[in-house]
C-alpha cells in the first residue's frame, strides 16, 4: 500500500466546488467528527484536491491524528481507499460519487443547494443527511447514521 495506512480508518471528504460554498459542511464540524472517530479507534483520512488544501490543513491542525492526503490521490486510489475504509463521510462532491459506487458505507451531507433525488450518489450503502442549511447538520446526527 502506497500510503501505509492503518487497518481501521474512515475517509473524510470535506471539500467541494469553490463556487458553491453552501454545499460544504463546516471545517469545525469535520474536525470534531474526526476527533470522535479517532477516539473510537478509526483514523481519519482526509481527501481532497489542492484547491481544498486550506480546509484539510485546518482539520489536520484540529485533529493531529488525521492523515492528510490532500492532492496525493488519483481516482483509482480513491476507489481503492474507499474499498478499504470502514466508512466514508463527505459533502456532495465528485469523489463521493466514486466512493459510493464502491459499495461500502457512505454518508453524504446535503443542504438545499442540490437534491440527492436528482444528483445524489448511488450505491448499496449510501445514506443522505439533508437539512435546508447544511450547517444545521450536527456531528451527532452524522455519527448516528455512521454507526447504524
Locations of regions flagged by a protein language model:
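Short glycine-rich anion-binding loops that position phosphate/pyrophosphate groups of nucleotides
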Residues: 15-18, 94-95
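CheY-like receiver
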Residues: 2-3, 33, 81, 145
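Residue-level signal for inorganic ion chemistry
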Residues: 12, 30, 142
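Nucleotide-sugar donor-binding patch of glycosyltransferase catalytic domains
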Residues: 61, 68-69, 97-148
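Glycine/threonine-rich flexible loop motifs
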Residues: 19-26
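Donor-binding and catalytic core of enzymes assembling or modifying cell-surface/extracellular glycoconjugates
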Residues: 27-107, 111-114
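Charged active-site motifs of nucleotide-sugar-dependent glycosyltransferases
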Residues: 3-13, 42-45
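A nucleotide-sugar donor-handling region in carbohydrate enzymes
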Residues: 1-9, 20, 137
Amino acid at each position: 500500500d502506497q500510503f501505509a495506512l492503518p487497518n481501521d480508518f474512515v475517509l473524510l471528504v470535506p471539500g467541494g466546488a469553490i463556487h458553491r460554498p453552501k454545499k460544504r459542511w463546516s471545517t469545525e464540524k469535520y474536525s470534531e467528527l474526526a476527533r470522535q472517530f479517532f477516539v473510537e479507534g478509526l483514523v481519519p483520512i482526509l481527501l481532497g484536491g489542492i484547491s481544498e488544501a486550506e480546509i484539510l490543513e485546518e482539520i489536520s491542525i484540529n485533529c493531529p491524528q488525521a492523515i492528510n492526503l490532500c492532492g496525493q490521490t488519483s481516482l483509482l486510489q480513491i476507489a481503492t481507499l474507499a474499498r478499504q475504509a470502514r466508512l466514508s463521510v463527505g459533502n456532495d462532491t465528485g469523489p463521493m460519487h466514486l466512493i459510493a459506487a464502491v459499495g461500502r458505507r457512505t454518508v453524504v451531507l446535503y443542504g438545499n443547494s442540490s437534491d440527492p433525488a436528482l444528483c445524489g450518489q448511488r450505491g448499496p450503502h449510501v445514506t443522505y443527511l439533508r437539512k435546508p442549511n447544511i450547517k444545521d447538520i450536527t456531528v451527532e446526527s452524522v455519527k448516528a447514521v455512521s454507526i447504524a
